[in-house]
Amino acid sequence: DMYYFRLQELVRKEICRDLPSVVSISMSNLERAQKYFMMVAESAPLRPKSIDVTRKINMLRQQSDSLLRFFHDMRLIYYSADQLGTTPAKQKVFMGDTNLLISFFGDKENRQLMCETYFLSQMRSVANVEFMVNGDFLIGGKYIFAVGDPLRGYDRLRFVPDAYAAIYGLPKSVFNRMPAWILGFSY
């Protein structure tokens, strides 16, 4: 599709144009930055392993951390800032929105990842979003959201105060479960 090709081209141009204005970077490192972005896109929702980054594009962890911050500031990706201290294998990194996810990742069939990416793109515009250890999301330090599959068990949230489930494919809200699309009205 031409739209997604154009979006990829636009992102590559932005990286080439904006990154040198923020940090002094050589042309070879600029190419590595683009390759690293592609690695991040392909490994979403997990951060690429440091050993893979070192082997494939010869980049140190400090460099990859600073590039992650840059991509986050450009809103190309989203990660929770409190995760940078943890090991990279456990860090979650999502694409900035579903258009970027489809454009670079290409997997429209991974509905769980699509739903989580959509959820993040909607909620981070109105509140701080943190990732919880169990895979849920903490919104604004108060609300807990489980995001995803309608067949997944959400009974664990039933008696937890301020806990909700954003579910794709759900036609209407029932108790603390809501359709994921309704979050589009959050801003």
Place the predicted regions along the sequence by residue.
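Accessory nucleic acid-recognition modules appended to NTPase machines
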Residues: 1-133
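A structural signal for short secondary-structure junctions
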Residues: 87, 138-139, 158-160
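Structural signal for conserved beta-strand scaffold positions within catalytic alpha/beta enzyme cores
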Residues: 95, 131, 146, 165-167, ...
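Active-site-adjacent loop/helix micro-motif of nuclease/hydrolase catalytic cores
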Residues: 105, 110-114, 150-159, 173-175
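Conserved catalytic cores of phosphodiester-cleaving nucleases, focusing on short active-site segments
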Residues: 123, 135-153
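Structural alpha-beta junctions
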Residues: 126-128, 159-164
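Nucleic-acid nuclease catalytic cores
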Residues: 140, 162-173
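Domain-level recognition of nuclease-like catalytic cores that cleave nucleotide substrates
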Residues: 171-187
